[in-house]
Amino acid sequence: MKKNPSKNEKEINHIAIIMDGNGRWASSRGLPRYEGHLEGLKTLRKLIRDLKDFKLNYLTLFTFSIDNWKRPKEETFRLMQLLRKFISNDLSELHNNNVRVKIIGTRTNIPKDLIDLIKGAEKLTLNNTGLYLQIAFNYSGRHEIINAAKKIAVSAVNGELDPNKIDSNIFESNLYSAGVPDPDLIVRTGSEKRISNFLLWQLSYSEVYFEECLWPDFNKSKLDEAIKDFMLRSRRFGNIINEFG
């Protein structure tokens, strides 16, 4: 069941994370890139467990971009294996902790057995009311927007929707993330300062925090630092606030 977003701008309801730096972490240690991804999975597993100490309702993770198909076939195969590993090994614990799992993105090019695992995870946790874990896999912000536009266009052509009544609410209801509030905070690890085609519609008023450490080195204290930084910011949402009292 969807929770209402917080009305208090100083509370964090939804954090989205670009988990960058696995490959560089491995390379700096003379290890194959896949070892970095495995270490990154350990970091993710521990962070999700640590979230019980934070008042957070939604967590979105950017795990695999559509653009990642440009990487060597062996690496993309191993990244598919990583999601299999996560669902197979961690789903029971997530379900027991009342976590709802939702995987967003296109299913194109994803092996059928992995699609079946994804569907099973979503079905099993559908009625869970704890943390909403949204995993962006085979995802692109531009693709999400184009897909939503196509769905709306089809509805309009079929006479199911008056084009003059199309607004942001209708558009958002056709996104992969329909029903999930926009992120309050975007965290990117790995020192790069870009958003890499992630949640392009949803992050219009999100605060962005760039963390220098590589994803496998990210931990609870690093997340706490990001949240503390967020708390010091003034979120105007296009408005004017009194900064002097």
Where are these regions (language model features)?
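Flexible, compositionally biased loop and terminal segments
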Residues: 1-245
